[in-house]
Regions:
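N-proximal low-complexity "stem/linker" segments adjacent to membrane-targeting elements
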Residues: 1-49
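Acidic donor-binding segment of Leloir-type glycosyltransferases
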Residues: 49-85
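Glycine-rich, basic loop-to-helix element that forms the pyrophosphate-binding segment
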Residues: 86-103
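Short beta-strand-to-loop acidic/aromatic patch adjacent to the donor-nucleotide binding site
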Residues: 106-116
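Conserved donor NDP-sugar-binding/catalytic core segment of glycosyltransferases
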Residues: 120-154
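Short, flexible, basic/aromatic active-site loop/helix in glycosyltransferases
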Residues: 157-178
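A short, conserved alpha-helix in the catalytic core of glycosyltransferases
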Residues: 179-187, 191-196, 202-229
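Active-site-adjacent helix/loop segment of glycosyltransferases
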Residues: 223-320
C-alpha cells in the first residue's frame, strides 16, 4: 500500500470544477454544503433547489454523471453551485477531503442526494447548538423510508482483544458516537484539518470512516449526535460493509495498535508478530505495512491523547451520555 498521508490535502484527486461563479443569496449560516451523489434519479435537482434557498454560504456537489447535457443543464440552472467532476473513481473520504479544500466556511455539512432534504433543514437553534458543541463533527439521526429509526449511535467495544463496534439508538441530546453514520454530519473545518482528514489510501468506505473517526477521538476531539438533527432516506438506507480486507489492516495499525504512554503514542516492535499472524499478508508485505504505520504513528505521536483501550474503558463513563 502507499505511504500514509499526513494532511487531508496531501493527495487530492484530480478533477474539473464547473460553476459556482455566483454568490449564494440570503446567507444566514457559516456553513457550506457538500452534496454527494449515488442516486441516478431526479432527487439531486430537488435537493439543490432546497439547499440554495436554505441560508448556506456555498453549495458544492460531486457529479459522476456521464451525461454532459444533464450536467450542463445543472450548471446553467444553479450558477451558485460548484460542480466537481472527478477524473477518476474516488472514495467517499476523498470526496469529502476535496469538498473541504473547496469549502470557505467554518463548517461543512456533508449530505447524500438520496436523503429527503426539505425546506428549513437548519434553523438558528440547531446552528447555535452545533457551534456551542465545539465538536469535530455534529451528526444527525436517521429514519428509513418507512420511518423506522436506524441505530446510529456507535460504541467501541473490546472483547478478548478484538475490537468491535456496537450500534444503538440515539435517545438523548448531545450523545457521543464513534463515527458519523454514512459520513453525514456537520464537520468543523479547523478540527477536520487538525486531525488530517480522511486517509485516501484506505479504499473501504467503512474502514476509511472509522479510521478518521477513531483518530479524531484518540487525538482529543469529539463526535456528537442529536435527535433534533434528523434525516430520512428516500429509499433503502445504506448498508455498512465491515469486511476485513487490506483497508482494515491499515486501520488496525493506525488506531488499534498504538499504545499511549507519557503523553505520546507508539507501536511496540513486538506487535509485529501478532499483526502478521492475524493478517493474511506475507511476511514481507506485513513488515512493509507495519513499518509504514509505525512511521506514521511516530510522526503524529504527540497528537494522541489516549489509546483505544482508554477510549473504550472511558466510553462507559465519561463518553457515554
Amino acid at each position: 500500500m502507499n505511504t500514509i498521508p499526513l494532511t487531508f490535502d496531501e493527495k487530492l484527486p484530480s478533477c474539473t470544477i464547473l460553476g459556482g461563479k455566483e454568490k449564494s443569496f440570503s446567507v444566514k449560516y457559516p456553513i457550506s454544503v457538500l452534496l454527494l451523489g449515488r442516486n441516478p434519479g431526479s432527487y439531486k435537482e430537488q435537493s439543490l433547489d432546497v439547499l440554495i434557498n436554505s441560508g448556506f454560504e456555498n453549495i458544492i456537489t460531486f457529479e459522476t454523471t456521464k451525461d454532459n447535457f444533464k450536467l450542463e443543464k445543472y450548471v446553467q440552472k444553479f450558477p451558485q453551485v460548484k460542480f466537481i467532476v472527478p477524473s477518476e473513481k474516488v472514495s467517499v473520504g476523498e470526496m469529502i477531503n476535496l469538498g473541504m479544500y473547496e469549502c470557505k466556511s467554518e463548517y461543512l455539512l456533508v449530505l447524500w442526494d438520496d436523503l429527503v432534504i426539505k425546506n428549513q433543514i437548519f434553523n438558528d437553534f440547531l446552528v447555535n447548538k452545533i457551534m456551542a458543541s465545539q465538536c469535530a463533527c455534529f451528526c444527525p439521526v436517521f429514519t428509513n423510508s418507512v420511518l423506522q429509526n436506524i441505530p446510529v449511535q456507535m460504541k467501541p467495544h473490546i472483547e478478548k482483544g478484538s475490537f468491535e463496534v456496537i450500534p444503538s439508538q440515539v435517545i438523548y441530546d448531545n450523545t457521543y458516537t464513534l463515527f458519523p453514520y454514512d459520513f453525514v454530519g456537520v464537520f468543523n473545518k479547523e478540527k477536520f484539518i487538525s486531525v488530517g482528514g480522511f486517509d485516501s489510501t484506505i479504499k473501504s468506505s467503512y474502514w476509511q470512516n472509522l479510521d478518521f473517526s477513531i483518530r479524531t477521538w484518540l487525538w482529543g476531539e469529539k463526535i456528537i449526535s442529536s435527535p433534533i438533527f434528523r434525516f430520512t432516506y428516500e429509499m433503502s438506507e445504506t448498508i455498512l460493509d465491515s469486511t476485513v480486507d487490506s483497508s482494515y489492516f491499515r486501520f488496525y495499525l493506525k488506531n488499534i495498535a498504538p499504545v499511549y504512554r507519557n503523553k505520546y503514542a507508539y507501536i511496540p516492535l513486538s506487535y509485529f508478530f501478532q499483526f502478521h499472524r492475524r493478517s493474511s499478508l506475507s511476511f514481507s508485505n506485513a513488515m512493509k505495512e507495519f513499518k509504514l504505520a509505525r512511521k506514521w504513528v511516530a510522526k503524529n505521536a504527540y497528537h494522541f491523547k489516549m489509546d483505544i483501550n482508554k477510549l473504550t474503558a472511558e466510553w462507559g463513563s465519561e463518553f457515554s451520555k
